[in-house]
Amino acid sequence: MQKEKVNIKKNDKVKVVAGKDKGKIGKVLSVNREKNRLVVENINMIKRHTRPNVSNRQGGIIEREAPIDRSNVMLMCGKCVTPVRIKMKELEDGRKVRMCGKCKELID
C-alpha cells in the first residue's frame, strides 16, 4: 500500500472539514508523517488524568490536543481565505513549492 503524502507543514493554518470539531480553524503544532496525523492547536481536545509525581506535585486532569487524521483537515489559503486543495509546482530553479488550487497563489 502506497503511503499518502502529507503536504501540510508545521505552523500552517488549517480548517477541520470532518469530525466533532468540523468548521474550526487552527495552527498545526506537529506532523506525524508515518501515521498521517496532525496535532492542531485547540482541536480534538482530550482529558488526561495524571498522578502526582516529582514534576507535577498536585496531579489532576489535564486537557490537551490529540492527533487528528490528515484527511479531516484542509489548508487555508492566505489570499482567498478558504480551505483549498494543494497543488505542487516546480519553479525554474528546480524547487518544488505548494500552490493554492483555486487562486494559484504560492504558499511556500
From Swiss-Prot:
SMART domains, per the entry: KOW
InterPro entries, sorted: KOW, Rib_uL2_dom2, Ribosomal_uL24, Ribosomal_uL24_CS, Ribosomal_uL24_KOW, Translation_prot_SH3-like_sf
UniProt keywords, alphabetically: Ribonucleoprotein, Ribosomal protein, RNA-binding, rRNA-binding
Statement: the UniProt record of this protein carries the keyword Ribonucleoprotein: yes
Subunit architecture: Part of the 50S ribosomal subunit.
Function of the molecule: One of two assembly initiator proteins, it binds directly to the 5'-end of the 23S rRNA, where it nucleates assembly of the 50S subunit. One of the proteins that surrounds the polypeptide exit tunnel on the outside of the subunit.
Full protein name: Large ribosomal subunit protein uL24
Phylogenetic classification of the source organism: Bacteria, Pseudomonadati, Thermodesulfobacteriota, Desulfobacteria, Desulfobacterales
